[in-house]
A protein has these predicted regions:
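Alpha-helical solenoid repeats of the armadillo/HEAT superfamily
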Residues: 135, 181-187, 204-211, 227-234, ...
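N-terminal "cap/leader" segments of large eukaryotic alpha-helical scaffolds
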Residues: 2-9, 13-27, 330-331, 337-402
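Concave beta-strand-loop units of leucine-rich repeat
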Residues: 88-94, 112-118, 139-145, 158-169, ...
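LRR N-terminal entry segment and analogous cap-like coil->beta motifs
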Residues: 22-170, 179, 184-192, 211, ...
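Core helices of alpha-solenoid repeat scaffolds
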Residues: 105, 131, 183, 207, ...
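HEAT/HEAT-like alpha-solenoid repeats
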Residues: 365-373, 403-414, 448-458, 488-499, ...
């Protein structure tokens, strides 16, 4: 049997690492002084394990809301005699100055800090601790690291754990003392988003051996300084850097470049125009190029071969057949060519193995893959194009598409535009058309990122997209591994008194499905979250608006499901004015048959609880139930459910009947008449989880009419395997099999 998309299991190393991180005190750590987490003295962890621990820890912190961060986690790696760190990747505001200071004694080779806006210039001081070993450094999006906190001087304080972390907004004093002097082994440097106040040329001057430099979104005052690496630099990224003829002239002198990125975001104003002459110069002078990105540039003159002159046949990557004139000078096809947001991506023959653009699915997926980490503004647009492909056409690379969207949503949990487009794309990529090709593990990943989005954003579009995506899953089965979390999020959506109507409808539908066909433990847990009160609040609001819509009906249906054989939830229903709302709904919506059925089904659950039945035994309620026995609404459903409520009440005997009117005998007579009027072969819209509440009414003589109702119910519900008198929606385990036709009571 072929494996489904995304079915590759995690490695044993990954599984063990995650387990240890979730159970630190039971595995490698103990609780020390002042509850500080300490590494056990008999443990030594090599770099392969330490790197994995830190990097997976960051992933769990950012993507798993059930994971509890440890305040002193990074202190576990403070002593290189017991732990060895070499390659660390940290991101987002979660990372603080004290975390870097904790690992300052480690011989780091690679340190990637991305969007770490809680870091101040204290961390620049810490960086100098790694200067003798660091080979690769990324400070992308860490603009606050170049500012002091409130103008305080640089410090690398042993007691920094107790120092109050100030907000980034308070950082105003630019740090001028930091220098890359002594970082002699540094080869790869990413300074994307460097503040305009920092002079890149001065900062970079001490670094003589760089082979890779990223200056995305950096304002360059001059360009000549780049030539100091002309014999070494293999990769240069100048995304969203203001290009000029001077800068291009400098770039083409860097003859050893293998990767050049001079792309831009099209919505960013630029005076520079890409010409055929400039593109030709880049190709002819930089003969070692294997990767080039010119995305977002408007071509000033025509760079493409006229259609009637294009080489015949299928699309080719051979440079000699290139539909783009300058690329005909290439010695070999490029490994990567960025043409996103340019007209060049639409030509027939492009001499590159991997192309970003918007022409087809492959180009769009390449764009998402290339731009997700550092260019969410481009990834957002590419995901939007993938959304159109999945919605209108057909996604042929399903696994890759899902994995890329999931990665984008994880990477940019706090980017609203990514969350909106990503959740919309997931809705179409997980629908029925693609479902059979997806593994359990892949679909669980989708659920996780969808719930992350719901948790982070209360914005209408994100919430709607996430709720709609959840509707593509089998409920409750596929959501059970996140059962508590998804219920909490849905109830939070339904809390506001005024809410988007479509979100309300979807969220209530999901709530209803989640409490249907689950065990009592789950129902009780959800009840304690405020499920019953939330549904009743929705009903109250609809009553005020005098509107009986799907939200109203789904809310009563959800209450019917959550109170099934759960006395605590039934008690909550009564405590929260449930009976008053029942009477108001009956009066306000006398012709809503589905509504009546759901309400009476719920009250049947309440009536099954002996301790609660006295609260139903009032003249007003008994009169209402008795009158509903005559109802022909929804077939026999309303009459049947009303009779069920009364059957349980009658089961308590005449001594419990303390009222004079209506008389017990009169009500019992009406019950007999109602049962006799029902067609025993009626198809019922009901699904009992067990027969126990019905069977409880049989072995007694206090209330024969209750026995009669229970007997009729069982006979109507079972499937006779001989004559097929009735049908039902019960599991096959509830079908009664008779050994011979002579024993069948239907014959």
């Amino acid at each position: 049997m072929a494996a489904k998309a995304g079915d590759n299991p995690d490695s044993l190393m990954t599984l063990a690492t995650v387990f240890c991180l979730r159970n630190l005190r039971k595995t490698m750590c103990y609780q020390g002084f002042r509850n500080k987490l300490c590494l056990r003295s008999d443990i030594f962890l090599p770099s392969e394990i330490c790197d994995k621990l830190v990097n997976i820890y960051m992933d769990l912190v950012l993507t798993d809301s059930n994971f509890e961060p440890e305040e002193s986690f990074f202190q576990l790696f403070s002593d290189p005699r017991s732990t060895r760190l070499t390659r660390v990747q940290l991101r987002e505001d979660f990372v603080r100055d004290r975390d870097l200071e904790a690992i300052r004694k480690q011989d780091l080779i690679e340190l990637h800090l991305t969007y770490c806006n809680s870091l101040s210039s204290r961390s620049l001081k810490t960086l100098t601790c790694f200067r003798e070993t660091l080979v690769s450094l990324c400070l992308f999006g860490c603009s606050h690291i170049f500012y002091r906190k409130g103008g305080a001087p640089l410090a690398c304080n042993e007691d920094s754990e107790d120092e109050d972390e100030e907000s980034p907004a308070s950082r105003q004093a630019l740090e001028t003392d930091f220098s890359f002097q002594g970082f002699n082994r540094l080869r790869l440097l990413n300074l994307g988003g460097l503040p305009d106040e920092v002079d890149a040329e001065t900062l970079l001057k001490p670094l003589k051996s760089l082979t890779s430099l990223d200056l995305s979104n950096v304002q360059l005052l001059g360009t000549a300084f780049l030539t100091q690496w002309k014999d070494r630099l293999a990769s240069l990224v100048l995304y969203n850097v203001d290009l000029s003829e001077e800068l291009v002239s400098t770039v083409v002198e860097l003859v050893n470049l293998r990767h050049l990125d001079i792309s831009r975001e099209t919505r960013r104003a630029s005076k520079f125009k890409m010409t055929r002459k400039i593109l030709t110069a880049i190709v002819q002078r930089l003969v070692n190029l294997v990767s080039l990105d010119i995305s977002g540039h408007i071509m000033l003159d025509n760079c493409t071969v006229p259609h009637f002159e294009e080489a015949m046949g299928r699309p080719s990557i051979e440079p000699c057949k290139s539909s783009i004139y300058p690329f005909q000078d290439l010695k070999r096809p490029l490994q990567f060519l960025g043409l996103y947001d340019t007209t060049l991506c639409n030509v027939t023959h492009i001499p590159a193995y991997k192309v970003t653009g918007s022409k087809n699915e492959d180009q769009v997926l390449n764009a998402i893959e290339a731009y997700t980490e550092f260019r969410p503004e481009l990834a957002h647009r590419a995901i939007n194009q993938l959304f159109d492909i999945a919605r209108i056409q057909h996604c042929s690379q399903l696994l890759r598409a899902l994995q890329l969207v999931i990665a984008a949503l994880k990477c940019h949990k706090y980017d609203k535009s990514i969350q909106v487009t990503g959740s919309a794309a997931l809705f179409y990529l997980t629908n029925t058309e693609y479902r059979s090709d997806q593994s359990v593990r892949l679909r669980r990943e989708v659920i996780q990122v969808v719930l992350n989005g719901m948790e982070q954003y209360q914005e209408v579009t994100v919430q709607r997209n996430c709720c709609l995506t959840l509707c593509n899953f089998s409920i409750p089965e596929e959501l059970e591994f996140q059962y508590s979390r998804v219920n909490q999020l849905l109830l939070k959506i339904l809390e506001p008194a005024r809410q988007d109507e479509s979100i309300q409808r979807i969220a209530v539908h999901l709530c209803n499905a989640l409490v249907c066909q689950v065990d009592n433990h789950h129902k009780e847990a959800v009840g304690k979250m405020g499920f019953v009160k939330t549904m009743l609040n929705l009903i109250q609001k609809k009553l005020q608006d005098r509107m009986c819509d799907q939200v109203m009906e789904f809310s009563w249906s959800a209450l019917w499901n959550i109170t099934d054989e759960t006395p605590d939830n039934c008690q909550m229903f009564l405590n929260c004015r449930g009976m008053s709302l029942f009477l108001e709904c009956l009066q306000e919506f006398p012709d809503k048959q589905e509504l009546h059925r759901n309400m009476l089904g719920l009250l049947g659950n309440v009536a099954e609880v002996k301790a609660l039945r006295p609260q139903l035994l009032t003249p007003q309620f008994i009169t209402v139930f008795s009158n509903l026995l005559d109802s022909k609404a929804d077939g026999i459903e309303v009459s049947y459910n009303a009779c069920g409520v009364l059957s349980h009440i009658m089961f308590d005997g005449p001594e419990a009947w303390m009222m004079e009117e209506p008389r017990r005998d009169t009500v019992m007579e009406k019950m007999w008449d109602a049962i006799q009027s029902w067609d025993v072969s009626s198809r019922r819209n009901i699904n009992y989880r067990s027969f126990e509440p019905i069977l409880r009414l049989l072995p007694q003589s206090i209330s024969p009419v209750s026995q009669h109702w229970a007997t009729w119910a069982l006979f109507n519900l079972v499937v006779c395997c001989w004559c097929g008198v009735t049908d039902c929606c019960l599991p096959r385990s509830c079908i009664i099999h008779y050994p011979t036709s002579e024993l069948c009571p239907c014959t």
